[in-house]
């Protein structure tokens, strides 16, 4: 749907549903609501799904100060366990793709409780595997890594997996292990995923595994050469005809990233723009945020600072609206990095400290956000705030950080950054 058609569809569907409620036609509201959830999911009209689904369930996450009193639900008598499961699942998926990832995990948990207790009519083993896949993705995206491991352990015990979902399960394990800095198991899991892909002669699966292997070398090992190698293999194995819209956007962005790391800035900008436009074909994907952030980085590296700041600021607004935790922290990190390069050290410090406060609040993966720590150490050092610098080093230690820190405290005018985080510009670190 284009934006205008999407808006009209959303307004029409939710207005009819609300009319049934105002008329106290609760059974009709349930009938229309469940039918509409299915059709609006197909249109990727997630706002309507969330509006209708949360109203039918009368179930929203409680804040710490909220009363524990249950809200009367006039729809409950007209929904059996199967209907409730499908509504919870639809709302969870809508939040996973479009809005608040933490909310998504909440509704997935509720859906899974029903799935454990009841046999859901016409919900096949493939449907169950797909549920675990999406549930684990929601946990990963929400930075709920403990929950992600629990879900994947459930998935591992499930006997209805086929080769594809064996591949998916090990792939998701690798992503979680990387996030929690268990690099040995991350590599074992991604290699198992890659082994399945090769045995099944599925190059598209290989492409996905190579992408995630590249992220291990990029984030854990800060290894530029192998980052380029495995992203290039992912691009080489990619089959566009078999790809989802989201995967198409991912592979375009990864190809752009390789061009960025190899100083092909014009090609990188072209591909990043393609990735963003591809992602925009889906209403509300996280890949939109990731692609726009990358585009901003490329613009900055191409001496288009004004365009880069505009791109990042737009991305920051959208990231905040959707509570994209990694996106928010990365964007503040990149704004801080850009200010460092402009010798605007006070706003650089403000951006980086805001990024660090959110990094702590969101409990996102330390492995993913090394550039934040490098840059914050640098800004504290240059501003003479040695107390904050030293405390941060003690708290945020990871491999490579000691040698960087030792260069800072030595007072050396020339900080050497070869062998550190691959994405850097004039010895300042950016995050994609």
What annotation goes with each model-predicted range?
Residues 7, 67-79, 120-125, 247, ...:
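Acidic, Ser/Thr-rich low-complexity linear motifs
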Residues 17, 37-38, 57-65, 72, ...:
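Amphipathic alpha-helical segments of tetratricopeptide repeats
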Residues 18, 34-42, 86-100, 127-143, ...:
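Tandem amphipathic alpha-helical repeat scaffolds
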Residues 13, 26, 46, 101, ...:
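TPR-repeat structural position
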Residues 272-341, 345, 350-365, 369-371:
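Eukaryotic tandem repeat interaction scaffolds
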Residues 7, 11, 27, 82, ...:
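Residue signature of alpha-solenoid helical repeat architecture, marking inter-repeat boundaries
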Residues 1-98, 103-107, 120:
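Extended alpha-helical scaffolding segments used for macromolecular assembly and cargo binding
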